[in-house]
A protein has these predicted regions:
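Metal- and O2-centered redox machinery and metal/ROS homeostasis
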Residues: 1-181
Length: 181
């Protein structure tokens, strides 16, 4: 069974959170989008750091999103307060614990799959929907089809449960960003 099939129910749940609906419909405001990017910075920093340490990004030098998320965040920065949601803090701690565990560190690929494949697919819709508030550099990919294929090549059969964990954290974060809903 593919990761897509294993996570299909959670992917649907993530897409149907109120926050995701706001993103996908273009009804998200600048402040909410900025705070979303702020939370993604914490998550992508951990995922990409552990992926780089293990060489998973060597064949995909254009895949890391951290710099482009930061550029989009700074474009919107007005000096007002942003916060990390409880789910983001929990997820960040989880990623660091997992990434530091020699027995489990390879599972970071499941989180790369959840976040980065989502950016390569659904992110293209989001880019159009946030164009009124952001340039959306985060969603700009060189050679996206090749990146999708390369990500698929590094995925292994033992990632199903961990991919579900990644989606569960994504759902929690989006619910936190919209007041727990």
């Amino acid at each position: 069974m593919s990761l897509k099939e294993i996570t299909k129910d959670l992917h649907h749940e993530a897409e149907t959170t109120i926050f995701a609906k706001m993103l996908l419909s273009g009804k998200i405001g600048k402040e909410d989008y900025r705070n979303y990017l702020y939370n993604l910075l914490a998550i992508y920093d951990a995922i990409e750091w552990y992926c780089k340490r293990q060489g998973f990004l060597d064949s995909m030098p254009d895949l890391p999103r951290l710099k482009s998320i930061y550029a989009d965040f700074m474009e919107l920065d007005d000096g007002t307060y942003c916060y990390l949601t409880p789910a983001t803090l929990e997820y960040q701690a989880y990623l660091h614990k997992m990434g530091s565990d020699p027995e489990r560190k390879h599972l970071i690929k499941a989180h790369l799959y959840c976040r980065h494949m989502g950016d390569l697919f659904g992110g293209q819709i989001i880019k159009k929907q946030v164009a009124h508030i952001s340039s959306g550099k985060f969603y700009d990919f060189e050679n996206a089809d090749a990146m999708k294929a390369t990500i698929r090549q590094i995925l292994t059969d033992d990632l199903g449960d961990e991919a579900r964990v990644a989606f569960e954290y994504a759902i929690k974060m989006m619910k936190d960003l919209y007041g727990g809903q």
